Swiss-Prot record:
Organism taxonomic ancestry: Eukaryota, Metazoa, Spiralia, Lophotrochozoa, Annelida
Taxonomy, superkingdom: Eukaryota
Function: Hemerythrin is a respiratory protein in blood cells of certain marine worms. The oxygen-binding site in each chain contains two iron atoms.
InterPro entries referenced in this protein's UniProt entry, alphabetically: Haemerythrin (IPR002063), Haemerythrin_Fe_BS (IPR016131), Hemerythrin (IPR050669), Hemerythrin-like (IPR012312), Hemerythrin-like_sf (IPR035938)
Gene Ontology MF term list: iron ion binding; oxygen carrier activity
Gene3D superfamilies reported in the protein's UniProt record: Hemerythrin-like
Source organism per UniProt: Golfingia vulgaris
Record's keyword annotation contains tRNA-binding: no
Pfam families reported for this sequence: Hemerythrin
PROSITE patterns: HEMERYTHRINS (PS00550)
Residues involved in Fe cation 1 binding: H26, H55, E59, D107
Alphabetic keyword roster: Iron, Metal-binding, Oxygen transport, Transport
Name of the protein in question: Hemerythrin subunit 2
Binding site for Fe cation 2: E59, H74, H78, H102, D107
């Protein structure tokens, strides 16, 4: 069972990783998915894809620089999300659920390690 999806769908302190750049990027991803839920336009999807790619790259560089042991697992999770965005079928509920659970399970594993 996953974590509850916030309503309204906004970042809150329970998602804090304690790396300001990552927390700020997570806020941007929440915002992007929120907007996509209200307007499933190609422009909103493209903006979410752009922000997601930038965030994943930044996170992966931090993990590589610190030789984080969970790097490969983390990249696989990122690749799966990107694949879903690149083959988008309008499932905003899935995207909301993925981000919440990714942060609170996968991202929380690197707290204090990168």
């Amino acid at each position: 069972m996953g974590f509850p999806i916030p309503d309204p769908y906004v970042w809150d302190p329970s998602f804090r990783i304690f790396y300001s750049i990552i927390d700020d990027e997570h806020k941007t991803l929440f915002n992007g998915i929120f907007h996509l839920g209200h307007d499933d336009s190609a422009d909103n999807l493209a903006e979410l894809r752009r922000c997601t790619g930038k965030h994943f790259l930044n996170e992966q560089v931090l993990m590589q620089d610190s030789q984080y042991a969970g790097y490969a697992e983390h990249v696989r999770a990122h690749d799966g999300f990107i694949h879903q965005l690149d083959n988008w079928h309008g499932d905003v509920k899935w995207a909301k659920n993925w981000l919440v659970n990714h942060i609170k399970t996968i991202d929380f594993k690197y707290k204090g390690k990168i």
